[in-house]
Structures are given as C-alpha cells and as structure tokens.
Amino acid sequence: MYVRRLELVDFRSYERVGVDLEPGANVLVGPNGVGKTNLIEALGYVATLDSHRVATDAPLVRMGAAAGIIRCAVVHEGRELLVELEIVPGRANRARLGRSPARRARDVLGALRLVLFAPEDLELVRGDPAQRRRYLDDLLVLRQPRYAGVRTDYERVVRQRNALLRTAYLARKTGGTRGGDLSTLAVWDDHLARHGAELLAGRLDLVAALAPHVNRAYDAVAAGAGAAGIAYRSSVELASSTADRADLTAALSDALAAGRTAEIERGTTLVGPHRDELTLTLGPLPAKGYASHGESWSFALALRLAGYDLLRADGIEPVLVLDDVFAELDTGRRDRLAELVGDASQLLVTCAVEEDLPARLRGARFVVREGEVQRVG
C-alpha cells in the first residue's frame, strides 16, 4: 500500500497544495514551523479520523475558511482509490470513496493503513492512561476497522450512563428527588457490559499479539538495553487473560452491580474499558517514572514499530511515517532504525536537516516552504 498523491485545501497552513509521492522512501525537508507535520497529520487523519496533535477538528481548518479538505489517492494491490474528507468544524465530516459519497465518515477507515510516529508519542510512556488506551484502540481499528463502530457505541453508552449518574448525584446532593430516578440504569448497565466486553476482547487479543513485537522492536532500537514488556490491566476482575465475550460480559455486569453505590455517590462510571490501563515495563520496573528520556523515547518508538510489524504479520502493508524522529537519535540508533524500516512499501520521513538521515533512507526528496511543497530529487 502507498499514497500516490495528497491534496489539501484549506487544511492547517495550506490554502491549496498537492504532492505526488513515491513508493519507498519519501523525505520532507524544511525548517521547523513551515508545514511538514501538517502534511503527515492529514494522512494520519485519513487513516484514523483523528489528529495526533489536537483533540478537536477546528484547528485543522485554515483560519477564515469554512471547511478543510483532504484528498489522497491510495494504491493497494494494483488498484487506486481516491479518498476525500471534508472537515467542517461543529458538524459531521463528509467523506467520499472513489466517486461515491460515504454514508458515514468512518466508512473510509481501512482505505489507508498508516502507522505514524511523532514527538508527541513520548506521552505514550510518560502520559496518562488515556494516551495508551487510544494507542491500543487506534491500532485495533487499523487491524479490524469494524472496531471503530464498537468504540463509538461504547463511548456513547458511557456518556449516557454518566449523564444519568450525574443527574442522580446532583439531585441527591441538593436533597431533591427530581432527576434522581435510576430506573433505567439497569438498561445502560446491560449496554455497557455488552459493548464493553466487545472492546475489551479486542484489546486483550491485541495486547497478546503485540507484546512480543514490542520487546523485539525495543531490543532492536535500544541495542540490548533491557527487556520491554506490555500488559493489560483491567478495571474489572478477569478470570484469565482470554477474550471470551460471554465471560467478559459477565465480569463487567458483576463489577457494575458491585460498584453501583460508589458510582451513584461519585456521579460517574467507575468500571469498564475506559478505566483500563496498558502497563509498560523495562525489566522489573514500570517505564513511567523510571525510564530516562532516551529510554522513554525508544519505548515509544518501539510501540509504533511493533504496531507496524504486527500489521505486516497480519498481511497488511501499511504506510510508515516518521515525523522528526532522527534528530533525537544518536548515530547508532539512526542506523538501526533505518535497517528496521528500510524495506517499507512506503516510508515518509520529515526532518529539518537532511544530514540527520542515514543514507539508505534518502529516496524521493521534497523541500517544504511556507504554503508549498517542491520535489527536488
């Protein structure tokens, strides 16, 4: 799989730009702040419907414009598919696949499989659990796009259930009875248990498959600096790490029943996949709080490379993007990383100084300036 062409209209700093890309290595060179990351952010958005930099869509649309448009031509197994997304702040995005409008924006998921490593990924190691849950769920959707719907359904149930609990909490706090009716809570418990079990099962399967890839990737990047491990820690008691849906549904139902009083007292849902954690370890110690800056950077990179390797093991050949990575690495780690990714079907690399790149990665070369991208090699 590779992206043959990317076009942006009123996206971030670009009023209009088009870039023809090549299979193999593509290097985007330019000073910081000229828009290199905006280009790869657009590709990441097509792959995940999320930005790796901001939580909402509004900053993606160029100031003063009503909407931003991303178009990319994706070639997979000899066939080209045009994917288009129109981002309208405050409204549902519109999408097209080929010549046909998509019923929902999320229908484009799976058209472009892409793994992106960026400086923000340091938060995978140092940040809060939500960062690691998002990492798992994004990778889950890349492997099996149907999980986008599972995640959306689960998040909707949590919002509805939280609204009910919050209303009851406020009513009781003020001594009133209006709004304190919890008669429908059992219905939302059932929905949460079913949708939560589906999401939890996917995550457990993913972590089991991913763990050996993480250890191998960290060893390759950090050159024997220690064993890297990952494990899934659920907010409910699980009989085993297996992903049997019926058992997981029962476990979630039991946990919701046991925690009902505490949830009413706090006005929020305290158990479920939205409260779970992906734990990261280096040797016997947790990576968060103990890993050095270099170790944290290598671990974050290993998580992305592991996802890339897992997709390839599944028979998926994703696009790999490395945003401003090599400037953070010493010469030895640069060369080892180049060895790991040199055979990617398509690799996009951004850098401020081309000399930071190992020679084997210097493929098609583009210079990025304010508002324009020019191929120079």
Curated annotation (Swiss-Prot):
It comes from the Bacteria. Pfam families: SMC_N. One of its GO terms (molecular function) is single-stranded DNA binding. GO terms for biological process: DNA replication; DNA synthesis involved in DNA repair; double-strand break repair; SOS response. The keyword Cytoplasm applies. PROSITE patterns: RECF_1, RECF_2. Keywords: ATP-binding, Cytoplasm, DNA damage, DNA repair, DNA replication, DNA-binding, Nucleotide-binding, SOS response. The RecF protein is involved in DNA metabolism; it is required for DNA replication and normal SOS inducibility. RecF binds preferentially to single-stranded, linear DNA. It also seems to bind ATP. Belongs to the RecF family. This is DNA replication and repair protein RecF. It comes from Salinispora tropica (strain ATCC BAA-916 / DSM 44818 / JCM 13857 / NBRC 105044 / CNB-440). The gene is recF.
